UniProtKB/Swiss-Prot annotation:
NCBIfam families with a match to the protein in the record: dnl1
Protein species of origin: Thermoplasma acidophilum (strain ATCC 25905 / DSM 1728 / JCM 9062 / NBRC 15155 / AMRC-C165)
Gene3D superfamilies: DNA ligase, ATP-dependent, N-terminal domain (1.10.3260.10), DNA ligase/mRNA capping enzyme (3.30.470.30), Nucleic acid-binding proteins (2.40.50.140)
Protein name: DNA ligase
PANTHER family: DNA LIGASE 1, DNA LIGASE 1/3 FAMILY MEMBER
Catalytic activity annotation: ATP + (deoxyribonucleotide)n-3'-hydroxyl + 5'-phospho-(deoxyribonucleotide)m = (deoxyribonucleotide)n+m + AMP + diphosphate
Cofactors: Mg(2+)
PROSITE patterns to which the protein is assigned, alphabetical: DNA_LIGASE_A2 (PS00333), DNA_LIGASE_A3 (PS50160)
Amino acid sequence: MLFSVVADAFEKMESTTKRLELTDLLVNLLKEADDDLPLLIYLLEGKLGPDYLGIETQMSDKLIIKALSVASNISEDEIAKEYAKAGDIGTIAKEIAEKRSLRSLVQEEMTVKYIHDTLMKMARTTGSGSTKARVDAYMDLFLNSTPKEIMYITRIITGKLRIGISDATILDAIVKAFADEKYSEDIENAFNFHPDLGYIASELRKGNIDAILKLGPTPMIPFKVMLAERLRSVEEILEKMGGRCAFEYKYDGMRTETHIERGKVRLFSRGNEETTNQFPDITKAASETFKVDSAILDGEAVPYDPDTGELYPFQVISHRRGRKYDLDKVSSEIPITVFLFDIVYLNGRDLSKTPYTERRKILESIFTESDSFRLAKRIESGDPAEVHRFFNSAIEDGCEGLVAKSTSPDSFYKAGARGWLWIKLKRDYQAQLWDTLDLTVVGAFYGHGRRKGTYGALLLATYNDKNDTFETVCKLGSGFSDDVLFSLPKKFEQYVSKEKPARVISNLEPDVWFYPAVVMEVIGAEITVSPIHTCAYGEIEKDSGLSVRFPRFTGKWREDKKPEDSTTSREILEMYKEQKKTITEEKS
């Protein structure tokens, strides 16, 4: 497939703000692909393969600027200045290509496969001379591409394609292009257990729907973890759960999948990125702890004080993420315990459709607790007083609260789903919301007075998981230290968009738009009806949405979450209804 066809389609996608039109363009593009369909899918995602393979070009913006300088005889400083103004290195590459006089003497045919192969060479290049090899590979693409093509190729390399599509949009288009839409839910479930859109598209194109429907948990392939709904009281949870359920500590750590197969261990984050090399102590301990042929375990990695055993908050674990050196030293200074609470696969058996209580018994039977692996603390109860005591113990032990889990016969493990089989109960913030919110930054407003020179407020949005859009819910200007406040322009410069991104639904016009990328944790006073914001628009009142009143940044950037993992508009709507219900009860 010629990349010129892809670039033309990308240009049309980038210019539309209509979701249905965007999906139709994507469907038509997928249908034009041949055997290179999986490669096209990966490029659409701004990747070279599924996340769990961890393939990256190692081509930074700085290196691209260096290559563009070589190609154009324009200084790196000058290109960097233009990049700072534009906020998109792809646009800069296009502008330089339009002015170039040099082209490759032997023109390569720019196909999807050729581009993917070239980017894979970048990714696999190591050792001395690897930087030059990557620059040379980029130069090859630059000299053989049209200006439009190099713009999109450069964006693919940086992982910021800027055409307003997500995995959900791509999956929807794959189903429309290659399958009967009656299988849509089943295909989504398969993707949640096997998050490789390239593979799924390829099999569906061949007509292998049965192979896709059989997909389930597989050792060494991470899945999208199960998530919890939220309620604000023990009594509400027990009522929702039929009077009795299990309650587990909700640990403040990093969600971690532990995969074991024939003595080999791999760890994955909730974003399906491999973290094995960052936690060699946990990897080694897993090999020694679990005497099984194969298993997939779900848990929370939590840092702790080696002297007192006290649990540290989530932020401390960031000192270990991404490190390549001194890991042994850091491992001893900041040891990790993985608190396990579920098992979805054991010795060739898929346990995802086994009830929760049986899964828990199986989990308890396969290992002896140690400093590295422990069971999440748990009780089963229908007594509110007992649960309240357990909740207080969780807070005292440094946890966020509790997760209630259904013990019904159909309490299956539902990958990627947020449902009422699991319900979280976090610390009561008194007059504030009873839980924090994870919101995506979609815009910013310039600061004035003391905040001149930085952003005075950020525009935050919830995720509408039905429409695959981001809906504004508040302007945030509180909770920032001066250091964080004045670092905001630098933090967000790579996400700047010249116009409102297609997936953002907003009535407000900020000074700067951002592509949805950064998630931050926020607390607020209450949820209110808003004629300005678009979250859950029209659900409570016509021509009005919902907003967070008096939002405040908690100080926690949710780097472990993708924008699509943000608090959903539906959750905000449920919180508003619960809030109204509580106020009514208090008045009566």
